[in-house]
Amino acid sequence: MTSLDILGIGNAIVDVLARAEDAFLARHGMAKGGMALIGPDDAERIYADMGPGIESSGGSAANTCAAAAALGAKVGYLGKVADDALGQVFRHDINAAGVRFPTAPLVGGAPTARCLILVSPDGQRTMNTFLGACVTLGEADLDEAAIAAAQVTYLEGYLFDPPAAQAAFRAAARIAHAAGRRVAITLSDPFCVERHRDAFRAFVRDEADILFANEAEICALYQTDNFEAAATIAQSEIDLAALTRSEKGSLILTATTAHEVAAEATTVVDTTGAGDAYAAGFLAALTAGRELAECGRWASVAAAEAISHFGARPQADLKALVAG
């Protein structure tokens, strides 16, 4: 019997969110809407210049896991935090969300990762990530039994940045496939895709069963400005792709079918975690045996909830929302 519906593997990060004008981004040389990796000195400098904000447990795959658990899925998560105050906050929060988190903390090394997120007046988020303890996630941290017992192992594309984590990522895919399970990957960020395009393309083509990407990410992967062209390539290379297009909704592709899913109407407050929530809704429905069109509807409902408030974790009753 499958003990988990979804097992997420990603960078365990504490988010620090604050509002910021475009001038703030320009002053610090940030590319609006992107994610940049920063060192400890830059993290201190940017943090000191940020206005009032909120701290909450984050990380892309962890956000997906929390939202999927809120939708009733049985969920686990693997990611590395330090044995420090932020690490304890992360562990408490993800356990409180109903997600199993067995990874042992890092002792005596780098601090727990944090992501400094600047939310612009138009709701766009610009992220600056200090990976800290994240980079130490390795194959020794993999829970092979959990991976083998999960319907879907969900891998966060940001793990292509730390070499040890990328190796763990590939090992997890091998374990999942050896057990006859499915592997999903989210591309995470167009800049991350550009840093590791060849590795991403090979993984998507040869090792992944399910792909999540937004318009910018899928176009970056296939080096085109044409979404339709990128979608056509994706359809030929992967069993199942869910491609999001913000207010244009999403496109769900198999080798022989295409489902267009409308975006749910909502007021955009903060786009942080929209893609994470979309993946959560989709995978929660998929592992519950729903049809693909219904998976897309759950995904759109979850994404709309995520962007309707400040912060990435759900604040409304997602089960009630998808029951609609």
Predicted regions and their residues:
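Short, conserved phosphate/pyrophosphate- and ester-handling motifs at nucleotide-, phospho-/glycolipid
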Residues: 68, 214, 275
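Conserved phosphate-binding/catalytic loop of the ribokinase/pfkB sugar-kinase fold
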Residues: 102-106, 117-163
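A glycine-rich helix N-cap at a beta->alpha junction
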Residues: 93-110
